[in-house]
Amino acid sequence: MTVEAEETSMDLRFKVAGRISRPVHEVFEAVVDPDQLSRYFTTGGAKGRLTTGATVTWDFAEFPGAFPVEVVEVEQDRRIVLRWEAADDAQSTTDQPVAGAAYFTTVTMEFEALEGDRTLVTIAEEGWRRTPEGQRASYGNCEGWTNMLCCLKAWLEHGITLRSGFFA
């Protein structure tokens, strides 16, 4: 697993990556399929398959409220681009989407087939404002995406769910 942080004068961004010992199509499907995603990552439930132009909802049991996710681009077995609200200290205590940051970040996931039916998954997120809240939110999301990669690996390679109890 690699973690790379970059800071520019305009925004905050990061990139995390990890290798999964499964074929690229299987790994890709575990991300775009809401039933699979709900088993290891969006433990409060995911609604909607990731397809270009769709808006889906992700809910995390540890964080109240559902998060709307705009699917900007899906290239089968290669790339997923998402946009969602930056969530700078925004919290929801209802079933309504989290709102409050008034700007969005962009998440780019890339899937690369490796030898031996392995897959390199790289996740980058960018677009936070250079504020203390933006910095905290970017660090929190970096932790979240790193956790997602670990959970994805454990789920696909060993059939176990790591997320339960990790954050709360």
Predicted regions and their residues:
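Tryptophan-centric aromatic hotspots in well-structured domains and transmembrane helices
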Residues: 28-31, 40, 58, 84-86, ...
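Short, highly charged C-terminal tails/helix-capping segments
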Residues: 154-168
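Beta-strand/loop substructures that line and gate deep hydrophobic ligand-binding cavities in soluble
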Residues: 91-147
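Hydrophobic pocket/interface hotspot
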Residues: 27-28, 37, 56, 71, ...
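Short beta-edge strand/loop motif at the mouth of beta-sheet-based domains
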Residues: 15-16, 35-70, 75-79, 164-167
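Hydrophobic ligand-binding cavity/cleft-lining segments
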Residues: 1-47
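A short, structured loop/turn motif at beta-sheet edges
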Residues: 24-25, 72-79, 110-120
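Short beta-strand segments that buttress and anchor functional surface loops
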Residues: 55-61, 82-86, 95-98
